[in-house]
Amino acid sequence: MVDHSAALFNKAQNYMPGGVNSPVRAFGAVGGVPRFIKKASGPYLIDVDEKKYIDYVGSWGPMILGHAHPAVIQAAQEAVQNGLSFGAPCENEIKLAALIGEFMPSIEKVRMVNSGTEATMSALRLARGVTGRSKIIKFEGCYHGHADCLLVNAGSGALTFGMPSSPGVPLGTVQDTLTATFNDLDSVAALFEKYSKDIAAIIVEPIAGNMNLIPAAPDFLTGLRELCNQYGSLLIFDEVITGFRVAKGGAQSLYNIRPDLTALGKIIGGGMPVGAYGGRREIMNQLSPEGPVYQAGTLSGNPVAMAAGLATLKELTAENFYSNLKEKTERLVMGILSRAKAAKIPLTANFSCGIFGLIFTSEERVTRYAQAVNGNVEHFRSFFHKMLDNGVYLAPSAFESGFISAAHTNKEVDNTLDIIENIFSVSETYLRISV
């Protein structure tokens, strides 16, 4: 049988760095050849060799309704008929902004952009402009896009300036980025004690989705809110992943914490390129043209993206939408854990509504970045390829979250569990815990 994905990947490497337009897609973390997809429908992907996969990537989070949802496709098609881009305001921008604010009351005003990276980058610029301060606090293992000031690894301790984690990022660009330990409030308090008058904002994922999946402890987020109140800094929630996925009001509604600013993306575009950031009215009013903080974008508020996003968010109001999604997520994750336990496979998991993370480790709970990176990457790599060979598409990295959509039914979940049970039953002995 001809492997068309392999042929396309070889060809792609002649024209694109690594053959892809986003690094993780190249399968570098797991090895092998990335599948080239030609079609997606509901909970399934179909590759160029006509192989069908149950999809637990969901375009890295946006496809909460599943692929090619009829209402979203119809809205996008109708919008396309009227033009692809105007460079001028359109009515759906207002409708989408209003619905975002209705779902997430902390967002009193919102600015549309084109990606999650733009959203976090612009939110930080706004925070610095409003406070007149330069330093920000981020957390090791939290990914906020590829803006220079956010491409920072943790130092050897909490009280360190950031060091660039990519060539091409000047040291001076990240000298105002301070790194603390996720779920460790003391590390944040120590930074405030040393740099209190200089810290403009804390930016944090309330549920971290790029060091596998690690939810923040409730008292950790409460403590961040209190520290920001105490020192006059802004609290920014990066809900690019969690916004409208873990709950209609995002993770902030689950934790009952009101951030000053929120970054959004993924779901609000229904699969189209989009991002947004918003928050308190008096802060957002500092944005140009109303205020002095400048931010702009040629394609911001794109009419097709606005139509797709609006159609998606409307579907989230369906009765029992989130309770059903949470139930399916729990059915999948608990089913995986029970099968791992029966086969003596060292595996743990974290999950929230519509999102999950699997870590090959004997630790019962993973709550810190250091634990996540100590998971057995080789075990994941083996598991990933066995799942792929059996028609289940997982994220090709041990440190990425998985996603489940409203289009997944118990049929897909149970098929996945049957495949996993079979894989675990015949796995190499190195996947087993000694008893």
From Swiss-Prot:
Enzyme Commission number, as recorded: 5.4.3.8
Functional pathway: Porphyrin-containing compound metabolism; protoporphyrin-IX biosynthesis; 5-aminolevulinate from L-glutamyl-tRNA(Glu): step 2/2
Catalysed reaction equations from the record: (S)-4-amino-5-oxopentanoate = 5-aminolevulinate
GO terms classed as biological process: protoporphyrinogen IX biosynthetic process
Membership in a protein family: Belongs to the class-III pyridoxal-phosphate-dependent aminotransferase family. HemL subfamily.
Subunit and partners: Homodimer.
Protein name, entry field: Glutamate-1-semialdehyde 2,1-aminomutase
Species, as recorded: Coxiella burnetii (strain RSA 493 / Nine Mile phase I)
Taxonomic lineage of the native organism: Bacteria, Pseudomonadati, Pseudomonadota, Gammaproteobacteria, Legionellales
